[in-house]
Curated annotation (Swiss-Prot):
Cytoplasmic topological domain: 1-7, 56-66, 103-110
InterPro entries found in the cross-reference section: Membrane-integrating_Mistic, Mistic_sf
Subunit structure: Monomer.
Native source organism of the sequence: Bacillus subtilis (strain 168)
Descriptive protein name: Protein mistic
Amino acid sequence: MFCTFFEKHHRKWDILLEKSTGVMEAMKVTSEEKEQLSTAIDRMNEGLDAFIQLYNESEIDEPLIQLDDDTAELMKQARDMYGQEKLNEKLNTIIKQILSISVSEEGEKE
């Protein structure tokens, strides 16, 4: 049984065999297999191009503030209690108020 399987498929196993000299043998494929490989290579290149574009457009993610552990824990508790959207809304409102007061106080000092 294995011999029949081997005889039927051994040609496919010859793909890119490396000899001890380091020279690669030519791939042995049918025209249908060659078309499938060409399509697969095209798709891999498209995927690689997409990854390169993502990499090139990426930015370093630097946190705006560093939270203390106890503050982060309180925020997690609030998120669990009120939900992420409500927590975001409340924190953004508070931060805007604090920063607008700080900016106006700095303007008055000058």
